[in-house]
Amino acid sequence: MEGGGKPNSASNSRDDGNSVYPSKAPATGPAAADKRLGTPPGGGAAGKEHGNSVCFKVDGGGGEEPAGSFEDAEGPRRQYGFMQRQFTSMLQPGVNKFSLRMFGSQKAVEKEQERVKTAGFWIIHPYSDFRFYWDLIMLIMMVGNLVIIPVGITFFTEQTTTPWIIFNVASDTVFLLDLIMNFRTGTVNEDSSEIILDPKVIKMNYLKSWFVVDFISSIPVDYIFLIVEKGMDSEVYKTARALRIVRFTKILSLLRLLRLSRLIRYIHQWEEIFHMTYDLASAVVRIFNLIGMMLLLCHWDGCLQFLVPLLQDFPPDCWVSLNEMVNDSWGKQYSYALFKAMSHMLCIGYGAQAPVSMSDLWITMLSMIVGATCYAMFVGHATALIQSLDSSRRQYQEKYKQVEQYMSFHKLPADMRQKIHDYYEHRYQGKIFDEENILSELNDPLREEIVNFNCRKLVATMPLFANADPNFVTAMLSKLRFEVFQPGDYIIREGAVGKKMYFIQHGVAGVITKSSKEMKLTDGSYFGEICLLTKGRRTASVRADTYCRLYSLSVDNFNEVLEEYPMMRRAFETVAIDRLDRIGKKNSILLQKFQKDLNTGVFNNQENEILKQIVKHDREMVQAIPPINYPQMTALNCTSSTTTPTSRMRTQSPPVYTATSLSHSNLHSPSPSTQTPQPSAILSPCSYTTAVCSPPIQSPLATRTFHYASPTASQLSLMQQPQPQLQQSQVQQTQPQPQPQPQQPQQQQQQQQQQQQQQQQQQQQQQPQTPGSSTPKNEVHKSTQALHNTNLTREVRPLSASQPSLPHEVSTMISRPHPTVGESLASIPQPMATVHSTGLQAGSRSTVPQRVTLFRQMSSGAIPPNRGVPPAPPPPAAVQRESPSVLNKDPDAEKPRFASNL
């Protein structure tokens, strides 16, 4: 029984963890034998392992509990390891916005964390989370010390009270801990911006810099002095010397104010942090720092104003005794002292009264010097800070002041000054940036990203960019330059040399041509590319109807980009041909190149579909409107449409024609009213056949050739609407009464015109008429009549003194009457006798020529002489004598209709 109980007791002892008994003898007897027989072969080993408490493999049930005890021992170790890792991570720089700005990327931050781990034990990184929160606590403690300590030293006589001692001991302890941490905190090398983590280098740098000041401000020198004095004879302490000791202790307590250096350093670090993260927060922090420093200096000065009389036992001539404030409360004493100090520092007076004693006088002068210096520094810093907050607006104001001085120097008129002011307001919007310089300093990917973002609205509204290669869009946008045009500004002028093309970001512009239609361009449209493709002159004028914000592209940059993207060049050329077709013009260079591309087969199906979509969108974006300046204009007013802008400016009234031109043979049946034509939204491609009625005024070529179709009635009906006809009574009212002249030349001219009318009617009847035409056979087309009746090279001279010469198109295209005159230029009688109407004139009346060459207009408005065709013979003397009588008309009849009184 005993032998059986011992194993149980042994097993119980194993359960308790006491498995080793060195003083116990080994068991003997049958029980021991039974135990040896009953114990498995591995039982001894298992028991041995259990006795050593290191059991990783257990046979049977004897090893389960030691494994649980091992897990119980590992729990505190794991918890300690977790806390140690957390605390170590706080000493390392965290992945935050500030550290990413400092080191550049997350990989660099992780590399810096590894440096901290390998630097040594308890090395604190200056940008770690632990140092951040510790500096925040130290900042609050320093502000409290710098405010409370001067008040306690000055206005409280008892320095040994329990609250005061607790406050001083706690603050001194915290500052001593900060002193120790500075030996383990890494420093930043100002030369290389590298963070030093070597403990030896950190220690040497701190000992050479701020250690002495921090050590003196952290040691409680006043309490050490009091402890030493209390160890001496108590009789001595109670004598008059005790008062001096207290005074000296107060002075020693002022050494804690040297903690101001730490405050300045910490504030500077926080300014750097806010400056690198938030510009506005940095400005706010700087403003609060300036205000706080001014208030702190005023607080110290106020305490000094009262401390000096206190150390002198309040002499009778000091300001405290004069105001009878020796026994007042400390709040009243502090208020008067602060008012006196701020009056000195702000240079606005001496406070309640002027200083009397010598000590007050010197303190007042010191306050004035310190206050003036601080005030100047505050004003300077505040001014620089305000200017730095909005430097772009300040640059705009300086720039506009120069513009105002320029306008005053040149004495520009008021309306022009207003236009310049409006331009600057819409162009810069109150801020000026050197955008070109800013973008040039960036790398290519960042610059392209910025340009794509700035022009996102243009890309979104422009079909050409929507269907183009993204690389082409980026290359094109990087070459653009921003421009602004005011309402009424001519962006491009017809006939000028083209050096830029424009993309409309926002605004409305009108395309002005010589036809009876004006087209509008809106957001996403572009123009001016035709000259860049052909190296020619402008084919139309574009005028801004509203404030237009455009992007311009120079010809060099245009060609540079299109050389890399030939498909986009073909897209520009296709759209240019379609646009010229819509305004009734052609360009041989573009047509030849387009035909060459078709013959060579460079277009594939995909490109054809893309080009069709681009042309379709371009037609949809262009808005065609009827003319608004000529409400009574007929369908093809060749007289006004072919007049140059210079001649219109020079001539304020339509030309005067002879009264004899209004014969009965030239008048048709009257129409109810003159109707304004209603043009279609988009001109059809067949408008090339009518291009002769609206040729360009200032062409880059010396001559321009236009093709005529056969003069059928259907085409005549397309080219000209029925002209308003006057009754005979209306003609008599509009005709001025000429002076009596011989009637024989007039009768000859009328007979000649009647013969010409009959011949033309016979020719019209002989020609086949197109089916579906509504034009009667006896209708005479005005433009063909002018070609029949006159020589193409003959110069038609005006009869108005206000118009020196008409443009050359009048001699080739005279198709409709002027609204105010009511007669056609085709009915002007030819100033020549019947005997001269032979030869070339007869040949020209026989048929309509298939090709008509229009000469370029000269500066004087006349036509250069034709070298290929001999000039017509001069008119007879009888007709020359008749012209003066034609000009001698009633002046009263002409005044309401003409600007010049003839």
UniProtKB/Swiss-Prot annotation:
3',5'-cyclic AMP binds at G528, E529, C531, R538, T539, R579, R582. Residues 1-131, 184-204, 271-284, 382-902 are cytoplasmic. Disulfide bonds: none annotated. It is a multi-pass membrane protein. Highly expressed in cerebral cortex, cerebellum, throughout the hippocampus, in medial habenula, anterior dorsal nucleus in the thalamus, tenia tecta, several nuclei of the general motor system and in optic nerve layer. Detected in a subset of elongated cells in taste buds. GO terms for molecular function: cAMP binding; identical protein binding; intracellular cAMP-activated cation channel activity involved in regulation of presynaptic membrane potential; intracellularly cAMP-activated cation channel activity; phosphatidylinositol-3,4,5-trisphosphate binding; phosphatidylinositol-4,5-bisphosphate binding; voltage-gated monoatomic cation channel activity; voltage-gated potassium channel activity. It catalyses: Na(+)(in) = Na(+)(out); K(+)(in) = K(+)(out). Residues 889-902 have a biased composition (Basic and acidic residues). It comes from the Eukaryota. The chain crosses the membrane at residues 132-153, 163-183, 205-225, 250-270, 285-307, 361-381. Residues 639-680, 720-736, 744-769 have a biased composition (Low complexity). Residues 867-877 have a biased composition (Pro residues). Residues 154-162, 226-249, 308-333, 356-360 are extracellular. Keywords: cAMP, cAMP-binding, Cell membrane, Glycoprotein, Ion channel, Ion transport, Ligand-gated ion channel, Membrane, Nucleotide-binding, Potassium, Potassium channel, Potassium transport, Sodium, Sodium channel, Sodium transport, Transmembrane, Transmembrane helix, Transport, Voltage-gated channel. Residues 334-355 dip into the membrane without crossing it. InterPro entries: cNMP-bd_CS, cNMP-bd_dom, cNMP-bd_dom_sf, Ion_trans_dom, Ion_trans_N, K/Na_HCN_channel, K_chnl_volt-dep_EAG/ELK/ERG, RmlC-like_jellyroll. Residues 1-75, 634-681, 713-824, 858-902 are annotated as: Disordered. GO terms for cellular component: apical dendrite; axon; axon terminus; basolateral plasma membrane; cell surface; dendrite; dendrite membrane; dendritic shaft. The segment S4 is probably the voltage-sensor and is characterized by a series of positively charged amino acids at every third position. Belongs to the potassium channel HCN family. Hyperpolarization-activated ion channel that are permeable to sodium and potassium ions. Exhibits weak selectivity for potassium over sodium ions. Contributes to the native pacemaker currents in heart (If) and in neurons (Ih). Participates in cerebellar mechanisms of motor learning. May mediate responses to sour stimuli. Homotetramer. Heterotetramer with HCN2. The potassium channel is composed of a homo- or heterotetrameric complex of pore-forming subunits. Interacts with KCNE2. Interacts with the SH3 domain of CSK. This is Potassium/sodium hyperpolarization-activated cyclic nucleotide-gated channel 1. The gene is Hcn1.
